[in-house]
């Protein structure tokens, strides 16, 4: 059979997806985290892989799904949180713009799976399935009640799940995980389609969403999930020593307030007393596309006058950040390669060819 006749849509997908294959899985496994540091990789959206100096591996909000894929239904799902927020009817054009950089089914070494809340782009059934099928049978699934309800509904045993609420602390090897208050107001209007929000006091945030502070021997990481700006970031900054903070950033469409702005990101960093602030989430949705350089420009305008004690860092999906080695860097660039140039003799027609 000729090659063009044997190739199918399915074979094409299997040969190209996930786009990075197991490249990043292998990189993470091979990484030896030096004492006094921690390493983390951006998996897209608010997905983070954190690795400590003791070799402890945890992932947070690792999501392997997609956004809109068809114009088939021109209307938004009835009762969707964005419909409640802005009174819209049209389909939200939120296409996923980020490649899949980590293969969940190539994960072998992991010590905990965490989620900040139960929105579809922060918790994933494929990740749960891969960990259940391929990893140690004592890996815990940690999150607020709504997340645990989802995991159990997918088939994760109840005894493998740990429900956390603000104030709880979970120890995973050499990483101490503190569950903190979340400020994700969108989560409060994520309700069953038939349930009305108008005129009804929302139920508590604690069962729906949490922020996390990861205390490793080499430093601390604050993960804010989908939280909006809140004055309570200052309380967290008073109560905890924070080295690196991650904040959900995006260009909110007209009539929508769902992501922090550049000014919010700077306010969050100042309130938390962090050393480094890193925006995330702006990468994933086509209709929330934002330029993180705006954060740096605004920081440059304000840093001397307001005596900022932090720096912004502009990351790339799939890239690594190591604390404190990268604390004075402003931007990430993927490894450029060719560091071994001229270790063998070039094969050119003549020296001045290039």
Curated annotation (Swiss-Prot):
One term of GO molecular function: L-ascorbate 6-phosphate lactonase activity
Record protein name field: Probable L-ascorbate-6-phosphate lactonase UlaG
Catalytic activity from the UniProt record: L-ascorbate 6-phosphate + H2O = 3-dehydro-L-gulonate 6-phosphate
Induction: Induced by L-ascorbate. Repressed by UlaR.
Superkingdom as given in the UniProt entry: Bacteria
Cofactor dependency: a divalent metal cation
Pathway membership, UniProt: Cofactor degradation; L-ascorbate degradation; D-xylulose 5-phosphate from L-ascorbate: step 1/4
Native source organism of the sequence: Escherichia fergusonii (strain ATCC 35469 / DSM 13698 / CCUG 18766 / IAM 14443 / JCM 21226 / LMG 7866 / NBRC 102419 / NCTC 12128 / CDC 0568-73)
UniProt subcellular location: Cytoplasm
Function in brief: Probably catalyzes the hydrolysis of L-ascorbate-6-P into 3-keto-L-gulonate-6-P. Is essential for L-ascorbate utilization under anaerobic conditions.
């Amino acid at each position: 059979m000729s090659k063009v006749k044997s190739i199918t849509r399915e074979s094409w997908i299997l040969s190209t997806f996930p786009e990075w294959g197991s490249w990043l899985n292998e990189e993470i496994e091979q990484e030896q985290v030096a004492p006094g540091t921690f390493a983390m990789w951006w998996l897209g959206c608010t997905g983070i892989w954190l690795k400590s100096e003791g070799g402890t591996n945890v992932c947070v909000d690792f999501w392997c799904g997609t956004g809109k894929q068809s114009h088939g239904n021109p209307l938004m799902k009835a009762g969707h949180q964005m419909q409640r927020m802005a009174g819209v009817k049209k389909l939200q054009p939120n296409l996923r713009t980020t490649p899949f950089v980590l293969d969940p089914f190539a994960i072998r070494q992991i010590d905990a799976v965490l989620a900040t809340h139960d929105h579809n782009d922060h918790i994933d059934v494929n990740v749960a399935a891969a960990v259940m099928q391929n990893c140690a049978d004592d890996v815990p699934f940690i999150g607020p009640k709504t997340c645990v309800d989802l995991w159990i509904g997918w088939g994760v045993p109840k005894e493998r799940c740990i429900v956390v609420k603000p104030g709880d602390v979970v120890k995973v090897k050499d990483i101490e995980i503190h569950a903190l208050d979340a400020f994700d107001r969108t989560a409060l209007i994520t309700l069953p389609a038939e349930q009305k929000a108008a005129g009804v006091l929302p139920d508590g945030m604690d069962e729906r969403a949490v922020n996390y502070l990861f205390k490793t021997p080499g430093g601390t990481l604050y993960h804010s999930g989908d939280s909006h700006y809140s004055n309570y970031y200052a309380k967290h900054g008073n109560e905890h020593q924070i080295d690196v903070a991650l904040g959900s950033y995006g260009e909110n469409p007209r009539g929508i307030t769902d992501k922090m702005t550049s000014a919010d990101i700077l306010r969050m960093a100042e309130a938390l007393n962090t050393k480094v602030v890193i925006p995330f989430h702006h990468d994933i949705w086509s209709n929330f596309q934002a330029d993180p350089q705006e954060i740096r420009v605004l920081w440059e305008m304000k840093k001397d006058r307001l005596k900022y004690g932090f720096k912004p860092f502009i990351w790339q999906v799939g890239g690594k950040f190591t604390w404190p080695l990268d604390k004075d860097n402003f931007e990430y660039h993927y490894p450029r390669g060719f560091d071994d140039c001229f270790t063998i003799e070039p094969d050119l027609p003549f020296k001045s060819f290039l």
